Amino acid sequence: VVITTKCSMNCESCANLMQYYKSQKNTDSEILKSVKLISDNVDHISEYRIIGGEPLMNKNWAEITKGVIDQDPNRSVYIYSNATICPKDEQLEMFKGKNLHFYLTDYGDLSRNMEKTMKTLDKHGIGFYRKPAGNWVDCSGIKKHNRSVKKLRQVFKECCATELYTLISGKLYTCPFIANAANLKAIPDNKADY
């Protein structure tokens, strides 16, 4: 679930294309309505991932996350963060006893609040997983590749994100790259993509 296109970093070749967003924005207004629509029409969703950009750049990240959890308290919710921003105590208090976890990608010195974030999450009993930013995958660039149908199928089959659906701007995409390329209007709108 993309809750913002704002990011505290500007990574070249970002898999979610955040470097291409000129007017970055939060996408609060329809998120919970879209999540409810999906939840009402899918038998079981074991996990939601709250992403961005950097999700903590959305000042309403805690309320949105709580809204996702409240729709089904048994599902796990993971917030993917680069630990440049430490969540505030008052934001984390509402997650006591909730099935919330943080996935912290460690970019070394760029993740300037990593230690503070881990201490704060520990203090509130919120689980987290810290992983170094290794194995960087250059998903592609926004350009016409002129691939054959056979080659397109092969690229999709080899993609590391084929089982990660992306909810952005009220649409559920089967590919995070396509989701952001479409949201940027860098490619034509194609209903087959969502």
Model-assigned labels for residue ranges:
Residues 1-79, 86:
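Conserved alpha-helical substructure of the radical SAM core
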Residues 27, 136-150:
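Short, positively charged
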Residues 38-42, 91-98:
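Acidic (Asp/Glu)-rich catalytic clusters
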Residues 53-55, 82-84, 105-107, 133-135:
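Active-site beta-loop-alpha junctions enriched in small/polar residues
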Residues 60-67, 89-94, 115-120:
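A short acidic, amphipathic alpha-helical/loop segment
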Residues 99-110, 129-133:
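Non-cysteine beta-strand/loop elements that form the S-adenosyl-L-methionine
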Residues 113-129:
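Basic phosphate/pyrophosphate-binding loop/patch that engages nucleotide-derived ligands
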Residues 144-194:
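Accessory C-terminal segments flanking Radical SAM cores
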